[in-house]
Amino acid sequence: MPDIKLFAGNATPELAKRISERLYISLGDATVARFSDGEIQVQINENVRGADVFIIQSTCAPTNDNLMELVVMVDALRRASAGRITAVIPYFGYARQDRRVRSARVPITAKVVADLLSIVGIDRVLTCDLHAEQIQGFFDVPVDNVFGSPVLIHDILKKSDLKNPIVVSPDIGGVVRARAVAKLLNDTDMAIIDKRRPRANVAQVMHIIGDVADRDCILVDDMIDTGGTLCKAAEALKERGAKRVFAYATHAVFSGAAAKNLASDAIDEVVVTDTIPLSEEMKAIGKVRVLTLSSMLAEAIRRISNEESISAMFN
């Protein structure tokens, strides 16, 4: 194995530690702190000349701080003559700002972030479950977008008490993801929630396509933000006779009123991964369980360093 160096910012320290343990490689010695005026201070405290460097840093909230930490760390490592720098971004912030809506005067911020990282000197990106896969094309360097679904599916398969399960897509846009999960769950049935607003200023209506009566519903998505839509979807499923509702998602964004929404009796359990650290408030509601992607990301790092196939991990 080439001379791999692992470094981490302050966004996901526990995930970075788990990845380093699985690779049997200690995290690199770096100072990532703040000056008295709040500016980011980075210093690499060991030799990285010619090394294959991986920086582990989600750009989750506080998004701008974590993004700038990553940018400054890349610059510090580039100036220290690192041989190759891979940005390992388990959760890629700003991914939902991937296009202009019709003629709206808005930026495509995902492209701005990609340009920023490319200009500062990254050689490759490793990320997980991009909200929009076309973001890979925003970069001028290779991007490996791995999937958290195998870890989620493995957990679902371990649920021995599931009764007549059905996979549910929370919207039309998530049908491809839900279909893939359903296929891997022994070709189980699938339902779709079609959200419609009949007319302006009228509450959104949830139409459920599929029979969920007396079944355990498994809602799958790439991320959960405020949880408002998820809560309404769970309520609609329960009204249609669903027995239990389990929500599975890779990224636990959990902003705004997420704790209040996910405490709803309509949702029996929420299962997420550790691409974003769980706050104490979210831990306190008692129904959120966290799975780790450390083994998968560690294997991806090993394969990248050894110039092996990443897609073979998911065949």
Swiss-Prot record:
Its EC number is 2.7.6.1. One of its GO terms (molecular function) is magnesium ion binding. Mg(2+) 1 binds at H131. It comes from the Bacteria. The active site is at K195. Binds 2 Mg(2+) ions per subunit. D-ribose 5-phosphate binds at R197, D221, D225, T226, G227, G228, T229. It is an enzyme of class 2 (transferase). It is found in: Cytoplasm. The keyword Kinase applies. Its main location: cytoplasm. GO terms for biological process: 5-phosphoribose 1-diphosphate biosynthetic process; purine nucleotide biosynthetic process; ribonucleoside monophosphate biosynthetic process. ATP binds at D37, G38, E39, R96, Q97. GO terms for cellular component: cytoplasm; ribose phosphate diphosphokinase complex. Its cofactor is Mg(2+). PROSITE patterns: PRPP_SYNTHASE (PS00114). Pathway: Metabolic intermediate biosynthesis; 5-phospho-alpha-D-ribose 1-diphosphate biosynthesis; 5-phospho-alpha-D-ribose 1-diphosphate from D-ribose 5-phosphate (route I): step 1/1. Pfam families: Pribosyl_synth (PF14572), Pribosyltran_N (PF13793). Mg(2+) 2 binds at D171. Involved in the biosynthesis of the central metabolite phospho-alpha-D-ribosyl-1-pyrophosphate (PRPP) via the transfer of pyrophosphoryl group from ATP to 1-hydroxyl of ribose-5-phosphate (Rib-5-P). Homohexamer. This is Ribose-phosphate pyrophosphokinase. It comes from Haemophilus influenzae (strain ATCC 51907 / DSM 11121 / KW20 / Rd). The gene is prs.
